[in-house]
A protein has these predicted regions:
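Topogenic membrane-insertion module of multi-pass membrane proteins
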Residues: 1-42
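Generic alpha-helical secondary structure signal
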Residues: 1-2, 18, 69, 73, ...
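Short amphipathic alpha-helical coupling elements at transmembrane boundaries
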Residues: 5, 66, 76-80
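Residue-level signal for inorganic ion chemistry
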Residues: 10, 62, 84
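Membrane-embedded alpha-helical segments that form the functional core of polytopic membrane enzymes
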Residues: 24, 32-57, 121-134
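Acidic (Asp/Glu-rich) catalytic motifs at the cytosolic membrane interface
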Residues: 49-74
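Intramembrane alpha-helical segments
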Residues: 76, 80-147
């Protein structure tokens, strides 16, 4: 299996912006005396997972709908036939699962067992984030096409 198309579909140029908030927030937490390297690493990995998931889902959604057929600029891999829609759909599923697992680890490290209610809120937010990343261009009610 050639990994180069998957790296291209991940759109590496979008990743620095996605982690910038985590870096700034972690720097501020460190400045305030609240720092745990495990939380920083897991937050970075969760954010990167969500961004790659969003990019894969966008490539899949636009490719299936034909939105990228006449695209000018950087080609999208499903539309170009380099990655099949079925392969990209599987990548979206796998990336969703891995990102959710990392997010669960982050929530556990950050809140522990004693803050179950707060953990539950963040688990629901994580599920919502994964759903939003996918629904941007996937499905009949994709919000990326409205307005």
């Amino acid at each position: 299996m050639n990994i180069k198309p998957w790296i291209q579909a991940a759109r590496l140029r979008t990743l620095p912006l996605s982690v910038s908030g985590i870096i700034v927030g972690s720097a501020y937490a460190y400045y305030q005396g609240f720092s745990d390297w495990r939380i920083v690493v897991l937050a970075l990995l969760t954010t990167l997972g969500l961004q790659v998931l969003s990019n894969y889902a966008n490539d899949y959604g636009d490719g299936v709908k034909g939105t990228d057929a006449n695209r000018i600029g950087e080609k999208r891999l499903v539309a170009a036939g380099i990655i099949t829609a079925e392969q990209m759909k599987m990548a979206v599923i796998i990336t969703s699962i891995l990102t959710f697992i990392i997010a669960l680890l982050l929530i556990y490290v950050a809140f522990g067992k004693e803050n179950f209610a707060l953990s539950l809120i963040f688990i629901l937010l994580g599920i919502g984030s994964i759903g939003a990343a996918i629904k941007y261009t996937v499905g009949k009610s994709a919000y990326g096409y409205s307005g």
